[in-house]
Each structure stands twice: as C-alpha cells, then as structure tokens.
C-alpha cells in the first residue's frame, strides 16, 4: 500500500505526532481539525461554536484542496462536540458546505473535552479524484 502525507500551510500545523491527512488506496483520511488560525495558531471564536465551526471547516477545506479534493469528494465526516446542545448551531454552519441532497455520511458525538478546550472538531474521509 502506498501512503502519501498531505500537508498545507493553509491549515494549522498538527499539535501532536500526526499529519493533517494521509492519502491511501484512493481515499483521503484527514486528522480532526479544530478552530486554530493557521498563521497564528490561536483559537478563533473562543466560546463561540458558530465561529469555531466556520474555522474548522475552513481548515478542513484547505486540507481537502491540498489533496486535490473538494467538498463533493467527502463521503464521511465525524463531528465531535463539547456540548450536544450546539448540534443545531453546528448543523447550520455545516449545511453551508454540504446540502442535504449530497451530504456525506456523518457521525456526531459529544465528548468530555477536546484539544485546546475547543467546542467542535471535525474530521473526514474523501474519495480522491481519478
């Protein structure tokens, strides 16, 4: 199996021993993205889940683009929420990137804590274009 590391300066550098994404066997597997500004590495929208969700999806989009993918290539996402009461607010932002007719499969879970105490984290799996 051939694996290719995907990295871009348009998304935050990893905050641990992992890569932004790995391309393997026709798929792209992204690391979870949080609301870090790629240039300053500071949290955007502290305490504001809408601002954080937008930054998360902006970061995720940059990783997808670096791999030659777009939102239309995404087949699965996982959304991690600090508080499930933010579900509707995150869905409103998420829906700006994925419409109901073409949205990928998704899991959404509430977790006790996320890196850097953010409110939302999202990762995805995409099919690489041929």
From Swiss-Prot:
Which CDD domains has this protein been placed in? YjgF_YER057c_UK114_family
A single Gene Ontology CC annotation of this entry is: cytosol
What are the coiled-coil residue ranges? none
What terms describe the molecular function in GO for this protein?
Answer: deaminase activity
SUPFAM superfamilies in UniProt: YjgF-like
The record's family statement is: Belongs to the RutC family.
Q: What is this protein called?
A: RutC family protein slr0709
Q: Which organism is it from?
A: Synechocystis sp. (strain ATCC 27184 / PCC 6803 / Kazusa)
């Amino acid at each position: 199996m051939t694996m290719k590391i995907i990295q871009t300066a348009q998304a935050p550098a990893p905050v641990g021993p992992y890569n932004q994404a790995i391309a393997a066997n026709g798929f792209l597997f992204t690391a979870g993205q949080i609301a870090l500004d790629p240039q300053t590495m500071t949290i955007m929208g502290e305490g504001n889940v809408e601002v954080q969700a937008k930054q998360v999806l902006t970061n995720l989009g940059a990783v997808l683009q670096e791999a030659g993918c777009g939102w239309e290539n995404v087949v699965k996402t996982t959304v991690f929420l600090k508080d499930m009461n933010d579900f509707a607010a995150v869905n409103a932002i998420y829906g700006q990137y994925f419409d109901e007719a073409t949205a990928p499969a998704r899991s959404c879970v509430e977790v006790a804590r996320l890196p850097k105490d953010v409110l939302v984290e999202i990762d995805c799996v995409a099919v690489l274009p041929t």
